[in-house]
């Protein structure tokens, strides 16, 4: 009886105490992007053992609080409604007849183990870079655990000009991006490749970008922000191309 009373009390506490409730993701920013950023935007899917991306910031400047890395791997972060309220953020640089288009996606948590997780963290931000020369994508780079893998265009599955990229759990480790298989079908609720509402670096609402790039996402970090952008381009740059990340 005491156990039952304790369980009932805990349930009531979770319902009645606002701090115990799951925070809803911020409202997405309206899509606002350059034609080039949109042309090369990745076509995304998200494996079932992880979260959907959500906005990192709202139009009013409210920053995502994320989720504790506990419970199910996709717990509280894989609702169909998340696909209808999400953003991707982009920034580009061109020189020496090459352009790099970098895309950031934010996820509320990154969890390696179901239940109590020792190795993941609140917040995850992953990145894709599309390398373009001669108005054709020549390489694609995907982020994983702070590093990049870079692939020839012939190794990449495409939907038009959009590389197909999947957010997945990397074995026993946490989540990252990978290339989609040539015949891979999307696993998200809609069963189609997803294009989160895109916001280019110079198209954020007034003041919102400054709040976003100053936000603390723990071990996760935006690659589009000053101080990180050139570093990420340098880490992922295909060998032998004349592109200068610091120009």
Question: What is the meaning of each model-derived region?
Answer:
Residues 22-126, 139-247:
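A domain-level signal for the mature, folded cores of soluble proteins
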Residues 130:
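Residue(s) in the substrate-gating loop at a strand-loop-helix junction
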């Amino acid at each position: 009886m005491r156990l039952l009373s304790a369980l009932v009390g805990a349930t009531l506490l979770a319902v009645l105490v606002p701090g115990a409730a799951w925070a809803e993701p911020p409202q997405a920013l309206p899509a606002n992007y350059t034609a080039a950023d949109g042309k090369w935007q990745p076509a995304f899917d998200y494996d079932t053992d992880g979260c959907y991306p959500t906005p990192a910031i709202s139009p009013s400047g409210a920053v995502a609080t994320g989720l504790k890395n506990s419970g199910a791997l996709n717990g509280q972060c894989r609702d169909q409604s998340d696909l209808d309220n999400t953003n991707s953020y982009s920034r580009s640089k061109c020189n020496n007849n090459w352009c790099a288009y970098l895309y950031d996606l934010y996820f509320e948590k990154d969890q390696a183990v179901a239940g109590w997780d020792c190795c993941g963290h609140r917040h995850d931000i992953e990145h894709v870079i599309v390398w373009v020369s001669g108005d054709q994508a020549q390489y694609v780079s995907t982020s994983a655990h702070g590093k990049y893998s870079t692939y020839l265009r012939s190794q990449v599955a495409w939907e038009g000009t959009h590389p197909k990229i999947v957010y997945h759990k990397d074995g026993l480790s946490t989540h990252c991006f990978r290339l989609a298989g040539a015949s891979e079908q999307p696993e998200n609720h809609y069963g189609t490749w997803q294009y989160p509402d895109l916001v280019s670096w110079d198209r954020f609402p007034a003041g919102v970008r400054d709040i976003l790039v100053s936000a603390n996402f723990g071990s996760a970090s935006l690659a589009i922000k000053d101080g990180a952008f050139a570093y990420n381009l340098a880490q992922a740059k295909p060998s032998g191309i004349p592109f200068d990340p610091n120009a």
